[in-house]
Amino acid sequence: MARCERLRGAALRDVLGQAQGVLFDCDGVLWNGERIVPGAPELLQRLAQAGKATLFVSNNSRRARPELALRFARLGFTGLRAEELFSSAVCAARLLRQRLPGPPDAPGAVFVLGGEGLRAELRAAGLRLAGDPGDDPRVRAVLVGYDEHFSFAKLTEACAHLRDPDCLLVATDRDPWHPLTDGSRTPGTGSLAAAVETASGRQALVVGKPSPYMFQCITEDFSVDPARMLMVGDRLETDILFGHRCGMTTVLTLTGVSSLEEAQAYLAAGQHDLVPHYYVESIADLMEGLGGLSPPPQFPDPVDGGYRP
């Protein structure tokens, strides 16, 4: 049972020593806006030197995978492969490839509520989007992502497509809001998805955390044992719940959204799926447990391109 204990000393060395690898959330864990969390790039280098594989899971659907990889590099995180980055955009593209209804020779199009990064990820997966040049195929899925230009007109069009019972409704995530560096908030995809669900009377399939589908995408590309993986995140209702649902050891870092007091309140209320096994002030605190670790076997190379037909 998770007890929200501080991870340090012998416990830290034992947890890292037994771990196959680490899944990191990004926003609030590795960086906040354009400011990296002090020590984060060095930690990833130390984990690599110790033979611990690192993968990255983000509900941010605004960037296509190549663009997200460039962001890592620009902020000083070097030596990463794009195939190690799993965003809700990547997972949405995969789910739609797998589940889009319709005959193979006319799979239909996706109506997207989202930005150009999400659209680019879908096109890279071979999906057709409503409004693209060429024939106007039947819309067979509505995808709700982070859309800074969400409008009544877009909501109306989405609901019109969803009157077809065979049209899928997919959401990248349910994050209701996101913190801004000035302390204010901006609506998240979860708020937009709730509007579409309410107006259409449909329930969305969600691909991002805490949905286990994101971990399924990882296991399709990498040989991972969830019992030997750490999930490190800053949001209890997203990252920590995701870790518990997938059978991982969970670590809350206090550099982002959730506080230690919130975790302790969930513990007192018996909501154990929202309570981390451990917490750290910052992921830089994990470096203390890496001394003297010998490299275990690495993950095999991922499937070509990260997509499966």
UniProtKB/Swiss-Prot annotation:
Active-site residues per Swiss-Prot or TrEMBL entry: D25 (nucleophile), D27 (proton donor)
Pfam families registered for this protein in UniProt: Hydrolase_6, Hydrolase_like
GO biological processes: actin rod assembly; cellular response to ATP; positive regulation of actin filament depolymerization; protein dephosphorylation; pyridoxal phosphate catabolic process; regulation of cytokinesis; regulation of mitotic nuclear division; regulation of modification of postsynaptic structure
Keywords, in A-Z order: Cell membrane, Cell projection, Cytoplasm, Cytoskeleton, Hydrolase, Magnesium, Membrane, Metal-binding, Pyridoxal phosphate
Entry note: cofactor: Divalent metal ions. Mg(2+) is the most effective.
GO molecular function: growth factor binding; heat shock protein binding; magnesium ion binding; phosphoprotein phosphatase activity; protein homodimerization activity; protein serine/threonine phosphatase activity; pyridoxal phosphatase activity
Complex and partners: Homodimer.
The protein, known as: Chronophin
Gene for this chain: Pdxp
